[in-house]
Structures are given as C-alpha cells and as structure tokens.
Design a protein with these regions (language model features):
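Carboxylate-rich, polar loop motifs that coordinate divalent cations or form catalytic acidic clusters
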Residues: 1-141
C-alpha cells in the first residue's frame, strides 16, 4: 500500500501540467475602449456571446470589437453594488437596495422591472440573483 501511494505521488508530480503551460491573454477593457469603469461588481455572458459588466455607473456590453454603456434608471442614488444574471433572452440587474431592472431587447435599454421594498415592505439587502432553467428570477436577501 505504501509503495503504491509513493508510485502514485511520483507519477503525479512528474507528469506535465497542461494548465500551467497554457498562455492566457488578459485585456483591460478600460484601455481597449477608452472608458472608465473601475468597480465592476457583476459580469455575465449572454447566449449571444456578449459580455455584460455592471457597476454603479451603469451596465457595459462588450463585443469583440465594440462596446456600449447603458445607464440604469435608478429610483434612488444610494447604489453601492449590482448583481446580474442572464439566461436565454432575459438579462436582469438588481441593486443591493432592491431595484430590479431588465434589459428590453426591442428598445435596447434597461427598464425598471420592480422594487423589492415596495413588494416586501422592507429594505432587505440583495445578496444574489439567479435565473433558473424555467426563466424564473430568484433573488436572495
């Protein structure tokens, strides 16, 4: 038993590791597109291949050679953090204070969908956002 464990460890340690040998490229979107988004709090990739990044200054949609910055129609300005989820044609953004927005593909803008405080009657902090396979939006507080 001891010898087989030793052989396994020697084989494992001497085997080349592919993850270490791969080259990865990191690109800074601020430098690539000349924009300023310093504090991104959420990022998702949608089914169309766009990368969406959310910050207090709005939501950024990035393609391979283009970008677009969307302003969110905040009801209050005390936004510290955003959460984001995407599945199918549904893209949802929620602020920590319960303002929930969805992307309207026809009008190409974000619209306020609802506010948690008006539905629940309290000011719970949004901690996560998920869209399940049935298209239902789950918000944890």
């Amino acid at each position: 038993m001891k010898n087989s464990l030793l052989l396994f460890l020697i084989f494992f340690l001497l085997r080349p590791c592919n993850a270490i040998s791969r080259d990865f490229t990191f690109s800074n979107i601020n430098e690539s597109f000349g924009i300023s988004m310093r504090e991104i709090t959420a990022a998702v990739r949608d089914d169309d291949g766009f990368i969406w990044a959310a910050s207090r200054s709005g939501v950024l949609r990035v393609a391979s050679d283009d970008y677009r910055l969307y302003q969110l129609p905040f009801a209050t300005t005390d936004v510290l953090q955003l959460k984001m989820a995407s599945r199918g044609s549904l893209l949802v953004v929620a602020t920590q204070n319960g303002q929930v927005f969805r992307y309207n593909r026809i009008l190409n803008k974000f619209e306020q969908w609802f506010t948690l405080s008006s539905l629940l009657g309290n000011d719970n902090w949004v901690t996560n956002l998920l869209i399940d396979v049935d298209g239902k939006v789950w918000i944890s507080t």
